[in-house]
Amino acid sequence: MKKLILSLLCSVAINIYGQERIILLNEGNWQADNGKMSYFEDGKVVSNQWFRDVNKRKLGDTPNDIIQINKNLIAITINWSNIIQFISPDGKRVAETEDVPNNRKLATDGRYVYVPIAYGSRITAPKNALDKATN
């Protein structure tokens, strides 16, 4: 049996205090639970396992998309884990959703996160995440 290896890279660039920062998302191998985030600051690699370094846990299985909702909140689709992970720009976990099947892409209007799934949906970032992000 052949093992199918898929790799997809998505990134978000953020500018904080005059520094150019890039967060690169790597989906890893399907069903291997090895998705990662790399973090670059001013053109230099800081970490290739940034989420794990900051949060002391894995990101999840097959992350697909990353989007900055506002200056204080970033959302990440973790497709095979069926979650949307919310982090702050410094990489700390803020909140996550549960049971969001087939989540692959994200869109935002700065307040809501829109996720196309099999049944169509609009997911509001968890209240505590938005409260932290707007204060």
PLM segments and residue spans:
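Hydrophobic h-region of N-terminal signal peptides that target proteins for export
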Residues: 6-18
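Conserved beta-strand positions in repeat-built beta-propeller and related beta-rich domains
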Residues: 22-33, 68-69, 74-80, 114-119
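Structural motif
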Residues: 31-38, 83-86, 121-127
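N-terminal, post-signal-peptide region of Sec/Tat-exported proteins
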Residues: 39-72
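A short beta-strand motif characteristic of beta-propeller blades
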Residues: 45-58, 91-98, 131-135
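Repeated scaffold domains used in trafficking and secretory/extracellular systems
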Residues: 58-67, 101-111
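Mid-chain, structured segments of secreted extracytoplasmic proteins
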Residues: 59-91
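A charged, solvent-exposed segment within the mature domains of Sec-exported extracytoplasmic proteins
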Residues: 104-135
